[in-house]
């Protein structure tokens, strides 16, 4: 990851995609607005579960001119990853699951989250009630890199409206077939979610915004 950052690979890849209409279509067809309120742009894909993948995660906290609710968005991952802060500053929190219940702790619904191969469709199966303990606050500034193990439960603090946050993510091999998510607003049953893939024009607008250029 360090070598990719030194060579400014995020900027080079974005400009290469913007300069090639066919690549713009290909990348748009595998990118989408994630349910956790960020744009997931898959720059370089890899269908091998033991392979690596490069993505951009760009937070836009005013989708459709609606206020984003105060949702927990706490989760872990199927894979470990390295993340370079390309724009802005990332604030996040890490948690562990409490082993003993306490009346002083918030109670969450814990779900088993299974995404589709394309990622834009997923199911959540209710697992159990759980309580969490926050163990770390993280602040990672523009230009810095951090590593997150797939078993780490965390959440990214959504940036304030108008603030830029974009990360360049190198995803490692898949470690398991599911993740866990914790919240208080999903029902205690199975739910499904589906969001559309991006259109080329939509992706172009988002990439130009990330670069800080006028559309």
Describe each PLM feature range.
Residues 27-30, 68-75, 135, 155-157:
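Catalytic micro-motifs at enzyme active sites that drive phosphoryl/nucleotidyl and oxygen chemistry
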Residues 96-150:
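Short acidic-glycine-tyrosine-enriched beta hairpin
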Residues 176-215:
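Long, compositionally biased interface segments
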Residues 77-92, 96, 170:
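Short, conserved beta-strand element in jelly-roll/cupin
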Residues 56-76, 93-94, 98-99, 150:
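Conserved short histidine dyad/triad with adjacent acidic residue
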Residues 92-93, 154-160:
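Short beta-strand His + acidic residue motifs that chelate non-heme Fe in jelly-roll/DSBH
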């Amino acid at each position: 990851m360090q070598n990719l950052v030194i060579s400014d690979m995020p900027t080079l890849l974005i400009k290469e995609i913007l300069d090639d209409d066919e690549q713009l279509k290909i990348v748009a067809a595998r990118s989408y607005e994630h349910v956790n309120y960020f744009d997931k742009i898959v720059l370089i894909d890899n269908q091998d579960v033991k392979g690596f993948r490069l993505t951009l995660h760009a937070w836009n906290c005013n989708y459709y001119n609606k206020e984003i609710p105060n949702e927990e968005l706490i989760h872990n991952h199927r894979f470990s990853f390295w993340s370079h802060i390309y724009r802005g500053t990332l604030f996040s929190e890490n948690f562990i699951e409490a082993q003993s219940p306490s009346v002083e702790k918030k109670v969450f619904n814990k779900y088993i989250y299974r995404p589709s191969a394309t990622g834009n469709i997923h199911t959540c199966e209710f697992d159990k009630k759980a309580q969490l303990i926050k163990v770390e606050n993280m602040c990672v500034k523009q230009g810095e890199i951090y590593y997150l193990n797939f078993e780490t439960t965390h959440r990214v603090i959504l940036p304030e409206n108008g603030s830029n946050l974009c990360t360049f993510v190198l995803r490692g091999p898949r470690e398991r077939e599911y993740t866990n998510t914790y919240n208080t607003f999903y029902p205690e049953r199975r739910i499904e979610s589906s969001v559309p893939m991006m259109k080329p024009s939509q992706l172009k607008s988002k990439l130009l915004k990330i670069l800080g250029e006028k559309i």
